[in-house]
């Protein structure tokens, strides 16, 4: 697909892998040739890392595109997309690079393919600096499906830092268009639940301690809440390596979902891991928003593509979200307005409304 190349500065704003994910996904969807320069320029190890490379190669293969400059450490790539196709698409970070971030870049694209897709993703399922697969399934999935599509996510094996080795299969069918969403009514918290897991050689007591510490911490602030956090020993054949972590979800009367999560590290006791997740959840409940700080930016591309006006209510707008908006406006020409919520209750809490006039992307194949 010919046309002028869209020029992206990979060092601005969030300045990391997210710029690559948003810009290449939109380039692929819109058939716009792309050049990204200064990739991760401000990071301690600039340029492409293995997980970025596997994401780029996956997008290239999704649309039989051309990709130049794609090697570890490269700070500039050019990408020329062709037609998006369904079928089986595979990506392997060969490290603990996050499978959830591979989903972020590929899912919007295969929604506009000609036929159903199966994404076979390998890497870390529960990795630092990325959503945990539990978050993707328990929070991201039910909310993003409000845009008018469904997907199936089958966790074959869990993989942890530093080895990775996780495996996830995502199945989804294409859509004609995406519906806009209106997520502005939070309602009140009706239940709090989650899972605290251990895998490999770690004793089950660690899972129980994480769950108990998290529940205690939550009950201090939300006194009458029923907190149901299940301790789980992952089956040996479904987890690769040693790890522990916890995710806690708060669900509201209007179907909003908020999460707090934490992963264990060597030398950090179980109570501290549990309390870390609980405090993150409580922080996300203190603002008046309808999505938590980690869901904000993951919805921006879908809002940009949708056919109509979408609105979401958030707490403080994160740098990741500001970055996604910047590139959705630059590349897709979607129009965003971010303003403080006018609701009196929200004003004191730093609550915002993100509104987007989507471009009404239509699947040419359907």
UniProtKB/Swiss-Prot annotation:
UniProt-listed PROSITE patterns: RTC
Pfam families per record: RTC, RTC_insert
Subcellular localization(s) per the UniProt record: Nucleus, Nucleoplasm
InterPro entries for the chain: RNA3'-term_phos_cycl_insert (IPR013791), RNA3'_phos_cyclase_dom (IPR023797), RNA3'_phos_cyclase_dom_sf (IPR037136), RNA3'_term_phos_cyc (IPR000228), RNA3'_term_phos_cyc_type_1 (IPR017770), RNA3'_term_phos_cycl-like_CS (IPR020719), RNA3'P_cycl/enolpyr_Trfase_a/b (IPR013792), RPTC_insert (IPR036553)
Residues of the active site: 320
Alphabetical UniProt keywords: ATP-binding, Ligase, Nucleotide-binding, Nucleus
SUPFAM superfamilies xref list: EPT/RTPC-like, RNA 3'-terminal phosphate cyclase, RPTC, insert domain
EC number: 6.5.1.4
GO biological process per UniProt: RNA processing
A GO term, aspect molecular function: RNA-3'-phosphate cyclase activity
Top-level division of the source organism's lineage: Eukaryota
Binding annotation for ATP: 104, 131, 294, 297-298, 320
Keyword Nucleotidyltransferase: no
GO cellular component terms attached to this protein's record: nucleoplasm
Catalytic activity reported: a 3'-end 3'-phospho-ribonucleotide-RNA + ATP = a 3'-end 2',3'-cyclophospho-ribonucleotide-RNA + AMP + diphosphate
Function: Catalyzes the conversion of 3'-phosphate to a 2',3'-cyclic phosphodiester at the end of RNA. The mechanism of action of the enzyme occurs in 3 steps: (A) adenylation of the enzyme by ATP; (B) transfer of adenylate to an RNA-N3'P to produce RNA-N3'PP5'A; (C) and attack of the adjacent 2'-hydroxyl on the 3'-phosphorus in the diester linkage to produce the cyclic end product. Likely functions in some aspects of cellular RNA processing. Function plays an important role in regulating axon regeneration by inhibiting central nervous system (CNS) axon regeneration following optic nerve injury.
PANTHER family: RNA 3' TERMINAL PHOSPHATE CYCLASE, RNA 3'-TERMINAL PHOSPHATE CYCLASE
Family according to the record: Belongs to the RNA 3'-terminal cyclase family. Type 1 subfamily.
Protein name from the UniProt record: RNA 3'-terminal phosphate cyclase
Organism: Pongo abelii (Sumatran orangutan)
Phylogenetic lineage: Eukaryota, Metazoa, Chordata, Craniata, Vertebrata
Gene for this chain: RTCA
């Amino acid at each position: 697909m010919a046309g002028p190349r869209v020029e992206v500065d990979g060092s601005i704003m969030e300045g990391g892998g997210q710029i690559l994910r948003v810009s290449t996904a939109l380039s692929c969807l819109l058939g716009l040739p792309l050049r990204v320069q200064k990739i991760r320029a401000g990071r301690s190890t600039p340029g492409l890392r293995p997980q970025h490379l596997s994401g780029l190669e996956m997008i290239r293969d999704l649309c039989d595109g051309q990709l130049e400059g794609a090697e570890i450490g490269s700070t500039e790539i050019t990408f020329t997309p062709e037609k998006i196709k369904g079928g089986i698409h595979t990506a392997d970070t060969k490290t603990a690079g996050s499978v959830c971030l591979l989903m972020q870049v590929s899912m919007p694209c295969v929604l506009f393919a000609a036929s159903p897709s199966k994404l076979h993703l390998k890497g870390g399922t529960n990795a630092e600096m990325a959503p945990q697969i539990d978050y993707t399934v328990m929070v991201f999935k039910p909310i993003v499906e409000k845009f008018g599509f469904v997907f199936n996510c089958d966790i074959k094996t869990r993989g942890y830092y530093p080895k990775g080795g996780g495996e996830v299969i995502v199945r989804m069918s294409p859509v004609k268009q995406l519906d806009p969403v209106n997520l502005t009514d939070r309602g009140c918290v009706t239940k709090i639940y989650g899972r605290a897991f251990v895998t490999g050689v770690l004793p089950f007591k660690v899972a129980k301690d994480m769950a108990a510490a998290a529940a205690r911490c939550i009950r201090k602030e939300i006194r009458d809440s029923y907190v149901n956090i299940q301790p789980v020993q992952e089956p040996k054949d479904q987890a690769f390596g040693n790890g522990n972590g916890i995710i806690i979800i708060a669900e509201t009367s209007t179907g909003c979902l908020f999460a707090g999560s934490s992963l264990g590290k060597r030398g950090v006791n179980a109570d501290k891991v549990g309390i870390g997740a609980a405090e993150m959840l409580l922080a996300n409940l203190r603002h008046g928003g309808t999505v938590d700080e980690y869901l904000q930016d993951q919805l921006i591309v879908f809002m940009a593509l949708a056919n109509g006006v979408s609105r979401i209510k958030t707490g403080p707008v994160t740098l990741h979200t500001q970055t996604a908006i910047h590139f959705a406006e630059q590349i897709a020409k979607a129009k965003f307005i971010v303003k403080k919520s006018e609701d009196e209750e929200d004003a004191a809490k730093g609550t915002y409304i993100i509104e987007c006039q989507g471009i009404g992307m239509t699947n040419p194949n359907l």
